[in-house]
């Protein structure tokens, strides 16, 4: 993600700032960091986390020395992949729901979009994210908290607007957004490895109903169907 405006500084930009070559070639350093993350994502799609550093630098087209100028090792790169994946997802959700006029309709859409992978039976991606999330959280708790912040911030914007409009009554919008993020993460992680669950088909609506009630929403709001990860039409907003 770009660092322009109010957007957070990306991992690639932070990695470039840490590089000893930053003053001479910051743009090149950012490009290399970005290429390593993109290469890691391609390798993860092929074989999960079971790729070597040598495979990574070959896929990224960078020297091994360049790799170690940006990260201390593979775990830091996987952390960067996790951060970028979450940030990209949050940006995609926001863009896809932009035409929904009601903040609760957008929030509802985000719940459906966040749980879409496990709901659609895509096991490889969710299982990688789940297993690596908790492993990396033990190694880098502060960094992983930072990685999930784009989703919490996305929820907070909609909760705050909904509260301003009198649609919900959360006692603490920031805490509500954080707890909502954690609930969706826990649900996502559960269904990534669950074999059979008769409630899987309704999990999105179950989570949304619970969150809306916790926020102080109304029965009318509960009737809005959860969004999918596609560009919604303006007619679906309220």
Placement of each model-derived feature along the sequence:
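Amphipathic, non-transmembrane alpha-helical scaffold segments
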Residues: 29, 33, 78, 82, ...
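Short secondary-structure transition hinges
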Residues: 115-157, 164-168
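Hydrophobic/aromatic-rich alpha-helical bundle segments in the mid-to-C-terminal region
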Residues: 126-130, 141, 145, 163-209, ...
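Helix-turn-helix
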Residues: 31, 35, 39, 43-76, ...
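N-terminal intrinsically disordered/low-complexity leader segments
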Residues: 1-31, 219-238
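Hydrophobic alpha-helical connector segments
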Residues: 80, 94-121, 177-180, 227-232
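Short, charged helix-capping/linker segments at alpha-helix termini
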Residues: 26, 45-51, 167-171
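Short amphipathic alpha-helical elements of helix-turn-helix/winged-helix folds
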Residues: 39-43, 117, 183
């Amino acid at each position: 993600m770009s660092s322009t405006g109010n957007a957070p500084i990306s991992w690639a930009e932070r990695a470039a700032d840490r590089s000893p070559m930053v003053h001479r070639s910051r743009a090149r350093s950012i490009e290399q960091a970005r290429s390593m993350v993109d290469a890691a994502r391609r390798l993860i799609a092929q074989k999960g986390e079971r790729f070597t550093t040598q495979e990574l630098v070959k896929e990224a087209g960078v020297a091994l020395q360049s790799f170690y100028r940006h990260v201390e090792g593979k775990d830091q790169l996987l952390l960067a992949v996790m951060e970028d994946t979450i940030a990209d997802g949050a940006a995609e959700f926001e863009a896809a729901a932009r035409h929904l006029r009601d903040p609760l309709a957008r929030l509802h859409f985000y719940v459906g979009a966040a749980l879409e992978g496990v709901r659609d039976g895509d096991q490889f991606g969710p299982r990688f994210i789940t297993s690596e999330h908790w492993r990396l959280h033990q190694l880098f708790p502060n960094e992983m908290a930072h990685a999930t912040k784009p989703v919490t911030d996305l929820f907070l914007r909609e909760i705050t607007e909904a509260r301003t409009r009198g649609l919900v009554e959360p006692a603490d919008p920031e805490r509500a957004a954080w707890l909502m993020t954690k609930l969706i993460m826990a649900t996502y992680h559960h269904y990534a490895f669950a074999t059979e669950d008769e409630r899987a088909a309704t999990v999105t609506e179950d989570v949304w109903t619970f969150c809306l009630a916790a926020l102080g929403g109304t029965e009318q709001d509960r009737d809005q169907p959860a969004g999918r990860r596609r560009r919604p039409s303006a007619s679906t907003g309220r």
